């Protein structure tokens, strides 16, 4: 359904729900944002190609270098045996986990957005620096924007 009307062909629906860049880890792409792009001739400019490649590489770096490294070499060790570490080290483990989870989620989103851009589809940025927020409310608005929007629309969270 798009604009309260069924899509013209079932293959359009299948394409929308199975579009692989966003299928596994998001971002959650709404039909109102995706369907109009489906019917346009997908063109990728040199600038968009560069932007897409940059997003893929940044996302890959966040996920594999930062998130996975912090997880394996720092956070998991502290969380597996917290009594072996001091209070400060445990606190650093919590901060490390916050960085790890951000880099994991935003890394996947950046890669998906970059791949979609290489295919001629533009998705919105999903994690615009949430840890630079001044309030919890602002943090929630910046953290996984597509999920927050979906929850707001379908679970009526305001």
Which residue ranges define each predicted feature?
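Membrane-embedded transmembrane alpha-helical bundles that form the catalytic cores
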Residues: 3-158
């Amino acid at each position: 359904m798009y604009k309260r009307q069924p899509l013209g062909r079932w293959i359009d629906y299948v394409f929308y729900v199975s579009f692989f860049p966003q299928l596994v880890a998001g971002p959650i792409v709404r039909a109102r944002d995706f369907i109009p792009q489906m019917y346009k001739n997908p063109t990728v400019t040199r600038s968009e190609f560069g932007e897409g490649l940059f997003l893929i590489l940044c996302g890959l770096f966040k996920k594999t270098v930062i998130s996975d490294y912090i997880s394996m070499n720092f956070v998991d060790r502290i969380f597996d045996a917290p009594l072996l570490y001091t209070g400060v080290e445990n606190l650093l483990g919590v901060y490390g986990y916050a960085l790890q989870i951000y880099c994991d989620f935003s890394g996947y989103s950046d890669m998906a957005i970059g791949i979609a851009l290489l295919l001629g589809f533009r998705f919105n940025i999903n994690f615009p620096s949430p840890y630079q927020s001044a309030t919890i409310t602002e943090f929630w608005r910046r953290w996984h924007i597509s999920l927050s929007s979906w929850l707001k629309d379908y679970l009526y969270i305001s």
